């Protein structure tokens, strides 16, 4: 899918390294810079791919995800906002509406090291169908040798949220994640609380855990691709580790049957309590990703 995105015809060349393209229903922004290749969907301000020069793709994007208006994309970094997980009210979308609506590209800049982009979503008739509040939501990205993502919400409200990052791995059987802390809520086991005794999370089957006292940096150890990915979390309360395992992967229409083998989600999350935004002090959630060969 990522190769397909970069082979799409250019609709508008915004700068020498930034272009607008289209895949089915969705407008895309493609970064082709000497230091980095990346791509975004305007729907959801959704980072689809990020590849620093000399590295394998860092993010995972499903080959089966539809690029359709209003349908959440499977992979990359979905922005879950203004709620994380199932909606409190029946009939509303899981993980909020921000990932399903078109955002505006408000600013972009570039230098020798990479590209900076700012996307904006504002309250509208479309958002008030889901949520009554007035808001301005900004998503800032800095892509280069590292990837920096910051979500900033302006208004008067309480939210839960996540940067639901899907990371590309060689084989989930050979992946370990450290730095998660010890206590977690196990969503595969009736939301019971558990303890990670050795501080290392592996993924032998379906895994869905909300870590309650995570360290600032989660480290993905990938023995197959022979690299580590550092995921540094900012302004967060939790980290989520997720992999659907084989049975759920088969049941998901937007994922290949064996899709679970080649990704792990390590998510920057504010979920176990609400996060307050005020007019004076916007709420924030941020993630910095670095990759290194072992």
UniProtKB/Swiss-Prot annotation:
Gene3D superfamilies: 2.70.98.10. Substrate binds at residues 74, 99, 208. InterPro entries: Aldose_1/G6P_1-epimerase, G6P_1-epimerase, Gal_mutarotase_sf_dom, GH-type_carb-bd. Its EC number is 5.1.3.15. Keywords: Isomerase. One of its GO terms (biological process) is carbohydrate metabolic process. GO terms for molecular function: carbohydrate binding; glucose-6-phosphate 1-epimerase activity. It comes from the Bacteria. One of its GO terms (cellular component) is cytoplasm. The keyword Isomerase applies. The active site is at 164, 267. It catalyses: alpha-D-glucose 6-phosphate = beta-D-glucose 6-phosphate. Monomer in solution. Belongs to the glucose-6-phosphate 1-epimerase family. Probably functions as a hexose-6-phosphate 1-epimerase. This is Putative glucose-6-phosphate 1-epimerase. The lineage of its organism: Bacteria, Pseudomonadati, Pseudomonadota, Gammaproteobacteria, Enterobacterales. The gene is yeaD.
């Amino acid at each position: 899918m990522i190769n397909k995105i970069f082979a799409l015809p250019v609709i508008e060349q915004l700068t020498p390294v930034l272009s607008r393209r289209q895949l089915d229903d969705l407008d895309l922004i493609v970064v082709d810079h000497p230091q980095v290749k990346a791509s975004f969907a305007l729907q959801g301000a959704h980072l689809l791919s990020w590849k620093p020069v000399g590295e394998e793709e860092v993010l995972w994007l499903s080959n089966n995800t539809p690029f359709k208006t209003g349908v959440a994309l499977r992979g990359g970094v979905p922005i879950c906002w203004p709620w994380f997980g199932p909606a409190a009210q029946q009939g509303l979308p899981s993980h909020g509406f921000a990932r399903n609506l078109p955002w505006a590209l408000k600013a972009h800049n570039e230098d020798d090291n990479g590209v900076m982009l700012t996307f904006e979503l504002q309250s509208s008739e479309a958002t008030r169908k889901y949520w009554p509040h007035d808001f301005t939501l900004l998503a800032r990205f800095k892509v280069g040798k590292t990837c920096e993502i910051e979500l900033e919400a302006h208004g008067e409200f309480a939210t839960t949220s996540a940067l639901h990052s899907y990371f590309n791995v060689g084989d989930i059987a050979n992946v370990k994640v450290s730095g998660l802390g010890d206590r977690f809520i196990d969503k595969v086991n009736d939301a019971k609380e558990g303890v990670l005794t050795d501080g290392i999370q592996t993924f032998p089957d379906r895994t869905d855990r909300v870590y309650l006292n995570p360290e600032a940096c989660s480290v993905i150890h990938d023995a197959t691709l022979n690299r580590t990915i550092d995921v540094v979390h900012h302004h967060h309360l939790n980290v989520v580790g997720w992999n659907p395992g084989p049975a759920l992967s088969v049941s998901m229409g937007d994922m290949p049957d064996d899709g679970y083998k080649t990704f792990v989600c390590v998510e920057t999350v504010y979920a176990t309590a609400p996060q307050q935004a005020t007019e004076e002090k916007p709420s924030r959630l941020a993630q910095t990703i670095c990759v290194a060969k072992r």
